[in-house]
A protein has these predicted regions:
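Glycine-rich phosphate-binding loop of ATP-dependent small-molecule kinases
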Residues: 6, 13-227
Length: 227
């Protein structure tokens, strides 16, 4: 068996509740540099062990708009062998994908033995958007959650490692980052109408995120919050 450690700023056991969660205490700059250098070398070593033991690893980065999901993935993959991972950014589903079962397009991203797949937003984001749009509620929501739990259990029961990270920022920080992106011609396209709506209705979105994380937090695939 491979022994692995999850590195993140804040880790809790059990159910992760954003409303009761507080940011982790930040180490000083020099300590952060030492940790970063140690992590860089350990990531490559870990990847080689995963390849040797033929362990497939699915890593989901979810969270708020402008929280830095893509940037975080970029920092991770910078230090590992590109032959043994892929990154998938999941945009809105196509017409064909809408006609398929909800999890169909995510199933296509499942990694091979000994490889990583990094998902820049996955089935959490799509589910949360549908809830916020009023398209998914009541029994339909419960069925969706059960299908997600079953899917994740099938993966872990069959030897996959499923890691789920939630990128957390507060309302003011999100607004600050969006304003910075909007101030430059080469980055303003990254802020969508939904991103602005999310910041305006931050509390409502937080409640939906909170419920989803509670409903999908399992011992075999728990949530990890990164601030």
């Amino acid at each position: 068996m491979i022994k692995y450690d999850i590195l993140c700023t804040k880790k809790k056991r059990g159910i992760y509740m954003l409303k009761s969660w507080t940011p982790g205490e930040m180490p000083d700059r020099e300590e952060m540099k030492r940790q970063l250098e140690k992590t860089k070398s350990s990531l490559y070593d870990l990847q080689m062990k995963i390849k040797e033991h033929k362990l497939p690893v699915l890593v989901l980065f979810e969270g708020w708009s402008a929280a830095g999901k893509g940037s975080m993935i970029g920092k991770v993959i910078r230090n590992i062998d590109p032959r043994f991972f892929k990154v998938a950014t999941m945009s809105a589903p196509t017409e064909e994908e809408v006609r398929r079962p909800f999890l169909y397009r995510y199933m296509k991203q499942i990694p091979e033995e000994g490889k990583f797949t990094f998902l820049d937003s996955g089935w959490m984001e799509q589910t949360v958007k549908e809830v916020l749009n009023g398209e998914l509620e009541g029994d339909a929501y419960e069925r969706r959650i059960e299908s997600i739990r079953r899917f994740e259990r099938q993966l872990t029961d069959n030897g996959y490692l499923v890691l789920k990270f939630f990128m957390e920022i507060d309302k003011d920080e999100q607004e600050k980052r969006m304003k910075k992106l909007l101030s430059k011609d080469d980055t303003k396209w990254r802020v969508t109408g939904f991103d602005k709506w999310q910041n305006k209705h931050y509390k409502k979105c937080e409640n939906v995120f909170d419920r989803y994380m509670k409903d999908t937090n399992m011992s075999s695939s728990p949530w990890y919050i990164i601030d």
